[in-house]
A protein has these predicted regions:
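Short alpha-helical scaffolding segments that buttress acidic/His motifs in well-ordered protein cores
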Residues: 16, 84-92, 120-122
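Long, amphipathic alpha-helical surface segments
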Residues: 1-31, 40-47, 52-65, 69, ...
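Short, residue-level hotspots on alpha-helical faces of the histone-fold
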Residues: 63, 90-95
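Extracytoplasmic
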Residues: 31-33, 85
Length: 165
């Protein structure tokens, strides 16, 4: 294993933005959560203007990814390659730090079962729509992409060209 990975590469940022999109005004994310920018969930007390700039959306994304990064550094007990670190960042950005901390994905990862951990991504493809837990095609595509990034050969510099072609 090479140098210990402690930060995201552009692959994490690009894949997150690919699935979140950049919406420069508040909107409902499809499961009832008010969101703005590049998937930033508006928290109680946060106030935003009617419209934000792309640059501000990117700042929010970087702050949110910092939270995901901290969750990886706090919870993962095994060395990760860059693609694994990035894939977990995209995943945690979407599911949240608490869900990740209690996940079977993390348990398998920390047990050294990288293959088993990889197979857990797809189990997170559901959301509550009108109170009913339903498979969401967009989440399925996202989880497959996260899994592919997680499993990408560490020597591959630009795995996204094969993942989101």
């Amino acid at each position: 294993m090479g140098e210990l990975v402690k930060n995201f590469s552009d692959n994490c940022i690009k894949l997150t933005e690919h699935f979140e999109g950049a919406v420069l005004h508040k909107y409902d994310d499809g499961v009832g959560k008010i969101t703005i920018g590049i998937g930033h969930m508006v928290k109680p007390g946060e106030i935003f203007p009617e419209k934000i700039t792309y640059e501000f959306a990117k700042e929010l994304l970087m702050k949110d990814l910092q939270i995901a990064k901290n969750a990886i550094l706090k919870n993962v007990r095994v060395p990760l390659n860059q693609h694994q670190f990035d894939a977990l960042g995209v995943f945690i950005f979407n599911v949240g730090t608490n869900a990740f901390a209690g996940s079977t994905l993390l348990k398998k990862l920390n047990a050294g079962d990288f293959d088993g951990a990889s197979k857990e991504f797809i189990r997170w493809n559901k959301g509550r729509v009108k109170g009913v837990l339903s498979e969401m095609p967009g989440l399925t595509r996202r989880r497959v992409a996260e899994q592919k990034l997680f499993n990408s050969n560490p020597s591959l510099n630009n795995p996204l060209k094969f993942i989101i072609a």
